[in-house]
């Protein structure tokens, strides 16, 4: 039995299948963990959703910003972006089933047996483990059982951009969603920045990657995430595993076997920006 973690799919189904063939993935024994953003911009988002869903308990994924946006468009809150190439999902006979399945996925996964955390974008520098799990649970509970339409309709804002223990209601939920699915850089006072997507070495000096800020949690338990393709040539601290290597931009898809920390990669079959 092996545990594999893979970076953002974003509709790059063929590359995922080639990676799984390389490692001889066996869904009856192995586990596949996905860092979110299963959909958007690649040309096989429908196939990605169906495949991950079909794996059942052999796969665990978290919600990314593109996944949440897909739910938003399914609810009629936002319009479909042509560049996202998700039309096939909306015309699929299992469309509603897929969206319902996606809505029930977590924002944070804690594998206690193998000692790692997985989320799409990261974990707030102001959170300990208990707070991170609580904040994820609060959002997940609304998405699964509450007024998820209202939550998704109100998630498209950048405020609040800093954590306070007394945050409540939509402000608290929005901050959590932004941390788990959108965060890259922070200011030194831990305010979130949502504009810069550059590699750290090219960013304004007032910004620092979230994982370089002081938080004992970052040294206590390994954190696996995606979302930030421009980290592809950046060395991250020990315990920080960045798996998005920009397959959808014509680079490669990366997979990590957790037991021996061996990496596997598959070059993009095409540059999806050109289609």
Curated annotation (Swiss-Prot):
<comment type="function">
    <text>Hydrolyzes diadenosine 5',5'''-P1,P4-tetraphosphate to yield ADP.</text>
</comment>
<keyword id="KW-0378">Hydrolase</keyword>
<comment type="similarity">
    <text>Belongs to the Ap4A hydrolase family.</text>
</comment>
<dbReference type="InterPro" id="IPR004843">
    <property type="entry name" value="Calcineurin-like_PHP_ApaH"/>
</dbReference>
<dbReference type="GO" id="GO:0008803">
    <property type="term" value="F:bis(5'-nucleosyl)-tetraphosphatase (symmetrical) activity"/>
</dbReference>
<dbReference type="InterPro" id="IPR029052">
    <property type="entry name" value="Metallo-depent_PP-like"/>
</dbReference>
<dbReference type="InterPro" id="IPR004617">
    <property type="entry name" value="ApaH"/>
</dbReference>
<dbReference type="Pfam" id="PF00149">
    <property type="entry name" value="Metallophos"/>
</dbReference>
<protein>
    <recommendedName>
        <fullName>Bis(5'-nucleosyl)-tetraphosphatase, symmetrical</fullName>
        <ecNumber>3.6.1.41</ecNumber>
    </recommendedName>
</protein>
